[in-house]
Amino acid sequence: MWKMIGASLLLLAGQAYGSQAVGCKARLKAVDEQLVEAKAQKNGDRVAGLERAKRNIQAYCSDEGLYREQQQRVAKMQQEVDAYLSELQQARVAGRPDRVADKQGKLDASQLRLLEAERELLALQQLIGKS
């Protein structure tokens, strides 16, 4: 069963892989798109905030820095998955079907978030050329 779930998650992640841009250029592009919308809506406060965000991205964003941050995020999410797996095993040992279902749901959601974070890490890794 676990192999089937893992395979289906990998399939979903593979389908979404090319659809999300990563890196500083992608962040800058997203802010630029929002900036165009905010200007069209004549939303001065939002324009000011987005222009500030754009300046910060241009000044401080680096793909290597994003890669390091994403590595930390993935490690933290892996710890979360491990904790939910431990809680699920404890609920099974205790014979609590209600808790087993709850812990299984939390584990599944956590694994999905981890998979998405790993996919983004891989995209950043390819962007900066690390193997």
List each model region and its residues:
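C-terminal-biased regions
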Residues: S19-K39, G44-S131
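Sec-dependent N-terminal signal peptides
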Residues: M4-L12
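N-terminal signal peptide c-region/cleavage motif recognized by signal peptidases
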Residues: A13-G18
